[in-house]
Every structure is written in structure tokens, then in C-alpha cells.
Amino acid sequence: MHADTATRQHWMSVLAHSQPAELAARLNALNITADYEVIRAAETGLVQIQARMGGTGERFFAGDATLTRAAVRLTDGTLGYSWVQGRDKQHAERCALIDALMQQSRHFQNLSETLIAPLDADRMARIAARQAEVNASRVDFFTMVRGDNA
């Protein structure tokens, strides 16, 4: 099975943003076993975070972030990759394994419904909760025209 680029980007993003303990628990509950070899052992490094002034202005480097990457190959030759923020090497390897399994038609539907969709829903709930927390303390400023400034 060959997933289109946008679909693969979506599941890789969901995996990268997932909570390591939650991903491990959900994957273990599925009882999926797969023989694979590690092509690139999980390794940790730094990446520079780029931003833009006002979202559209000149690019600048906002700082550094720790990133861990991994690559695995299933026995049938399917390659799986992952890049996750932080230093959790097991999480990176687990994400790479799931990426490889998601590319196989026999696992795609099951993993999409029982792993990727719930992880995505959990992430959206975390984002919504954080947004609600921020909105609760939001202050909207406005300017009133005074009589002497009119």
C-alpha cells in the first residue's frame, strides 16, 4: 500500500505529538507483533527553531529544540521513520515501527481506527483545553476617544 504524502504526514505528525506512555499502552493493547531491524538507532540532537515576525515577516532563529530520530525496516523491506521532540529514544523507535506498519495494507485500517484516530482526538482535546485556559485569562484592549482628542 502506498499512502499519499498528506495522509502519511498526518499520521507521522499524530505519532510525533503523542504522549509516549499513551502510545505504548495503545500499541501494546493491539497485540501487533512485527519483526524489524533498526537501520538508524534512535539518536538525539538539536534543531534550530525558526519563526517569522508577525507570522509573515523576516525569518529568524527563535532557539534550539532537542529532537530524536529513528529508522526501522520490516522483514518485507518496508521502511519506517520518525522524528520526535525530546530525548525519548523508545518513543522514536516505536513511532518509526508504527510508520512502517501503517504503510502495509493489512495494518493500515486497523491502526488508523484504533491508534491514530484516538491519539489525534486526544491531541485535539489537549489543544482545546490549553486554548480554553489561555482564553480564560485573555484581556481585550480598546481605545476610547476622549473629547479633547476628537
UniProtKB/Swiss-Prot annotation:
Family: Belongs to the PhnG family.
Name this protein carries in UniProt: Alpha-D-ribose 1-methylphosphonate 5-triphosphate synthase subunit PhnG
EC number: 2.7.8.37
Note: The sequence shown is that of strain K12.
An example Gene Ontology molecular-function term: alpha-D-ribose 1-methylphosphonate 5-triphosphate synthase activity
Gene Ontology cellular-component terms listed: alpha-D-ribose 1-methylphosphonate 5-triphosphate synthase complex; carbon phosphorus lyase complex
Domain of life: Bacteria
Assembly: Forms a complex with PhnH, PhnI, PhnJ and PhnK with the suggested composition PhnG(4)H(2)I(2)J(2)K.
